[in-house]
Amino acid sequence: MSGIVTYGSYIPRYRIRPEEIARVWGEDPEKMKNGIFILSKSVPGPDEDVATISVEAARNALKRSNIDPNDIGAIYIGSESHPYAVKPTATIVAAAIGMPFRTFAADYEFACKAGTAAMQNIKAMVDSNMIKYGMAIGSDTSQGAPGDALEYTASAGGTAMVIGRDNVIAEINKTISVATDTPDFWRREGEPYPKHGERFTGEPGYFKHVIGAARDIMSELNTKPDDYDYVVFHQPNGKFPTRAAKILGFREEQYREGLITPYIGNTYSGSTMTGLSAILDVSRPGDRILAVSFGSGAGSDAFDITVTDNILDYHRENAPGVRKMMESTEYIDYAVYSKFRKILVFGDNLE
């Protein structure tokens, strides 16, 4: 059976606390922090974007395995913040890691589930013998308008997953998707920041799709929450995934390991995949994982995954784990944050 052969993540080391953002905009710091259950969020450095984050995640994945990049036949990168409107991120990353000329490459978009959509397509290509291995990446330097609620959560990070049939460390037993036309969140071409339809964000958007996809895949597999050792959902904030888990009947010990948003914010396309990466960092043979992503617009991808015995010989230690990167931090104030995120616009002669 096909599944994850290796994986790697990258999280920028810079952080800003919600209290610092609230201070600038005259909001109640404790109210903002507790309202979204975010303690800090990651901030990309001035020289970091989706391409560099994806390269680092991909390299970390390759450090943990003996896979020759020439054997990777496809690379798909999901993101809301590709650095170019016309020029693929996938070709940049493919060149950086040494993939061959004969390569399937494309950038994906479906809000925050573009990365998991890439995983599904890579799995299908492996299963149909079109490729031996394929790499799916979910990565973002997400945007939030200054002073908007999204500014408190929109962060940066990404994860790469290589899928194949040889030396699989986590079998993908089944994957399904759900989708509807829901106007919960959007950004038009040329606009710097997204807008959100607040009344569509919760129940009609996130909860309908995440809970619906989770229930559908468990129904088809005849499983129940107690059959899983871990569960991870898309994490727009710290409260939505915990509420979804409780509605479905999961316990805190099942979702705690993959819940990373309180410490690094919402990495958008990287969110579910990085939460899954954190789980794989500590998983053991036989562990069963339910992963459900969410993308505004709207849709969810659900995965039923089983960790194999190959995890015992897998070199997780060759690249930093998610928790280690979460702990390697440098806090910045709003002035530096504004500079890094280019909120401050300089004249032509200034840098």
UniProtKB/Swiss-Prot annotation:
Which reaction does this chain catalyze? acetoacetyl-CoA + acetyl-CoA + H2O = (3S)-3-hydroxy-3-methylglutaryl-CoA + CoA + H(+)
Residue numbers binding CoA:
R199, K239
Membrane found in the keyword field: no
Instruction: Mention one GO biological process in which this protein takes part, according to its record.
Output: isopentenyl diphosphate biosynthetic process, mevalonate pathway
Residues recorded as binding (3S)-3-hydroxy-3-methylglutaryl-CoA, renumbered to this chain, are: D28, C112, T153, T201, H234, R243, N266, S296
**InterPro entries given for it?**
ACP_syn_III_C (IPR013747), HMG_CoA_Synthase (IPR004656), Thiolase-like (IPR016039)
State whether keyword Transferase applies. yes
Q: Report the domain of life of the source organism.
A: Archaea
As recorded in UniProt, its EC number(s) are 2.3.3.10
Report the pathway entry. Metabolic intermediate biosynthesis; (R)-mevalonate biosynthesis; (R)-mevalonate from acetyl-CoA: step 2/3
Per the record, the similarity remark reads: Belongs to the thiolase-like superfamily. Archaeal HMG-CoA synthase family.
* NCBIfam families reported for this sequence: HMG_CoA_syn_Arc (TIGR00748), PRK04262.1 (NF003274)
The entry's function note states: Catalyzes the condensation of acetyl-CoA with acetoacetyl-CoA to form 3-hydroxy-3-methylglutaryl-CoA (HMG-CoA). Functions in the mevalonate (MVA) pathway leading to isopentenyl diphosphate (IPP), a key precursor for the biosynthesis of isoprenoid compounds that are building blocks of archaeal membrane lipids.
Q: What is this protein's name?
A: Hydroxymethylglutaryl-CoA synthase
Q: State the organism named in the record.
A: Picrophilus torridus (strain ATCC 700027 / DSM 9790 / JCM 10055 / NBRC 100828 / KAW 2/3)
